[in-house]
């Protein structure tokens, strides 16, 4: 199985809208994430025009579109990026596709674009995503208790981070 990530293109819009609206994907995505065609188009266009500060990437498995993930700059001076919007189509789940895709995005952001820190936040009820973050090398850094209103219920946000030196140590580079 070959997994690769690539920057999303306008030709990916139908796939992205369908994936982000899928009944098995949508409940786990942050409310602020664009799902409508115009919002997704704006994100893809921004990713293409601001590649160092904003990105939407398509995950492919053996050449087939399988998912999406993204980043945006959180702090330019300190070189911090927020990661988010990871979604894998249910047909590709259970194969650790997201783990390999996350590693590729980490290497791109840290070694190619020069970010120092990558961070993400996951809903407390999303145990699958938390396990993925830990498998992908992220360190659990804390919990924002009852931080988000999801359909009238307060849920926690679990914070994860990865530093350049974490990835360098893993890769065996100084």
State where each predicted segment sits.
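Extreme N-terminal starter segment of soluble prokaryotic enzymes
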Residues: 2-4
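Acetyl-CoA-dependent GNAT
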Residues: 7-11, 21-93, 108, 113, ...
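Structural motif
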Residues: 113, 135-136
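C-terminal "cap" of GNAT-fold acetyltransferases
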Residues: 146-174
């Amino acid at each position: 199985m070959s997994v690769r990530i690539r920057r999303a293109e306008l030709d990916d819009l139908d796939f992205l809208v369908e994936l982000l609206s899928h009944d098995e994907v949508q409940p786990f995505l942050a409310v602020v994430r664009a799902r409508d065609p115009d919002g997704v188009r704006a994100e893809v266009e921004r990713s293409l025009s601001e590649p160092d500060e904003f990105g939407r990437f398509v995950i492919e498995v053996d050449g087939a579109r399988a998912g999406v993930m993204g980043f945006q700059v959180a702090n330019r001076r300190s070189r911090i990026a927020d990661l988010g919007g990871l979604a894998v189509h249910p047909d590709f789940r259970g194969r650790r596709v997201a783990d390999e895709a996350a590693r590729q995005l980490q290497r791109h952001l840290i070694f190619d674009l020069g970010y120092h820190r990558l961070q993400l936040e996951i809903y407390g009820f999303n145990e699958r995503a938390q396990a993925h973050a830990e498998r992908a090398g992220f360190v659990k850094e804390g919990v924002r208790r009852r931080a988000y209103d999801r359909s009238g219920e307060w849920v926690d946000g679990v914070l994860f981070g990865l530093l350049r030196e974490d990835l360098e140590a893993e890769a065996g580079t100084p």
